[in-house]
Amino acid sequence: MKFFLDTANVEKIKEFNALGLVDGVTTNPSLIKKEGRDFYEVIKEICAIVDGPVSAEVIALDAEGMVKEARELVKLAENVVVKIPMTKEGMKAVNILSKEGIKTNVTLIFSANQALLAAKAGASYVSPFVGRLDDVGQDGMFLISEVMQVFSAYGIETEVIVASVRHPIHVIESAKMGADIATIPFDVLDKLFNHPLTDNGIEKFLADWEAHMNR
């Protein structure tokens, strides 16, 4: 399973990339706004750090505008993937861009039907949002199982990016279901390292070693 970092924070990307854990990065307008920097500068800097795909989202809502933005975004770096919203206009743009060889990541997916439509339109990636479904009383992980089942049944090559990840359970459940990628906020990725028994074990080893050396 591949891990993408869901952030526009360059320092955090550098930190986790140095550990060999970052296969790609996803951004969105909200994450860029949080950093308070120029959109294009941030994307270029991230692309220079990470070898894998870096998703940058369009702002236009019409297909013509999305395509125009996408063509500009891919000029920034070879690893830019254009993030497109799941709408009719978005799918029109995805269809055009896929024929031009421009990779796309269809975002804001909340049903298996939407994921299937995006794949048929030519999306390189689809991003089902699990946390937001959980927030409204639905089972976000059930959506992932549905999408994986449909894609597997038809040999669909579009990769599934589990998005809106809120906690480590989302990550491991996605891995168990065979999802291609989880895009993870850095605070959640930090939590994957931790287990109280690991901490206890380290403390015991150190205490035993100190006792041995002081005999």
UniProtKB/Swiss-Prot annotation:
It catalyses: D-sedoheptulose 7-phosphate + D-glyceraldehyde 3-phosphate = D-erythrose 4-phosphate + beta-D-fructose 6-phosphate. Belongs to the transaldolase family. Type 3B subfamily. This is Probable transaldolase. Pathway: Carbohydrate degradation; pentose phosphate pathway; D-glyceraldehyde 3-phosphate and beta-D-fructose 6-phosphate from D-ribose 5-phosphate and D-xylulose 5-phosphate (non-oxidative stage): step 2/3. It holds the Pfam family TAL_FSA. Its main location: cytoplasm. It is found in: Cytoplasm. SUPFAM superfamilies: Aldolase. Transaldolase is important for the balance of metabolites in the pentose-phosphate pathway. The active site is at K83 (schiff-base intermediate with substrate). One of its GO terms (biological process) is pentose-phosphate shunt. InterPro entries: Aldolase_TIM, TAL/FSA, Transaldolase_3B, Transaldolase_3B/F6P_aldolase, Transaldolase_AS, TSA/FSA_arc/bac. HAMAP family: Transaldolase_3b. The keyword Transferase applies. GO terms for cellular component: cytoplasm. Keywords: Cytoplasm, Pentose shunt, Schiff base, Transferase. Its EC number is 2.2.1.2. One of its GO terms (molecular function) is aldehyde-lyase activity.
